[in-house]
Amino acid sequence: DGVLLKAVYATVQQSYAGRFFPINDAIREKGLNTVELKYALAIVYDLTGDSSLLDVVSMQDGVVPTHEGEALARDLSLGLTTPFPFKSSLLRDGSNGDQGALAILRAGDARGVAVVFKPTSQGLGHGHFDRLGFLYYDDGHEVVADYGAARFLNVEPKNGGRYLPENETWAKQTIAHNTLVVDQESQFGGDWETGQNYAPHVIAYETVNGIQLTAAELDTAYEGVSLQRLLALVPQPDGGQYIVDIVRARSDTQHTYDLPVHFKGQLIETGFKLDHATSQLTPFGTANG
């Protein structure tokens, strides 16, 4: 059913402003200009003639030295490009599509609003403990960010490239992501093999009266705690989008909850009083990031 073509298009959809979403052990600098995707797009364009792929190729800083690549260069020079349809998508996870999903909500053009919601499977040893986490982009910029992997890539003095110890002690931990932390611990006790056995359940992905929304639940990340999260894009009357984020945790016993938001913008206003650390910064805890 054209699964390879679908895989290429889905790969492009998992990007913003030319860079891939930095989830799990992704390298933040990796993007659409990776050589593997250059070859893939050249082949797909040769098969389909989809002029919107030229829009993606224009972000790749060159074409591959093949007959297919020559056709791309020719058609780019002829001005045959049409905009690539970056769109809202639900990319189901697992071999049977039943291990959660990656939900992408978009509004506007390629540089418009994009919200990425991650109720996915663990992703084996490269997975991070960030179920029900999210990312937010707008106007071509990353607004709510993911740390990605802590790794040297192709750096010869660093043994050719390796993961740093901080990839385990920080980058993979739940606190390094935009999702709820319970009792200052990482999801599944920081054990990926345990996490691999469980996946969130996507309970909504729909558009209602112009409002795009997605929601998921997970009751296995922390013993005795059920987690739910809903994210929505709500159009503003004068243009733009409100981002609505609702997180719910339920348990029969008492717990502490922390909700980190790795925000790269400027905090202007809140509906609650803030405590300010003006003289020194201290760690929130002693372990798990």
Q: Which functions belong to the PLM regions below?
A:
Residues 1-12:
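Aromatic-lined, polymer-binding surfaces characteristic
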Residues 285-289:
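Low-complexity, serine/threonine/proline-enriched polar segments
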Residues 30-66:
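Aromatic (Trp/Tyr) and acidic
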Residues 14-18, 183:
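Phosphate/oxyanion-binding loops and surfaces in catalytic or ligand/nucleic-acid-binding neighborhoods
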Residues 12, 23, 141-143:
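Short beta-strand segments in beta-sandwich/barrel cores
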Residues 10, 18, 112:
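Active-site-adjacent "lid" and substrate-binding segments of diverse enzymatic cores
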Residues 54-284:
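Catalytic and substrate-binding regions of extracellular carbohydrate-active enzymes
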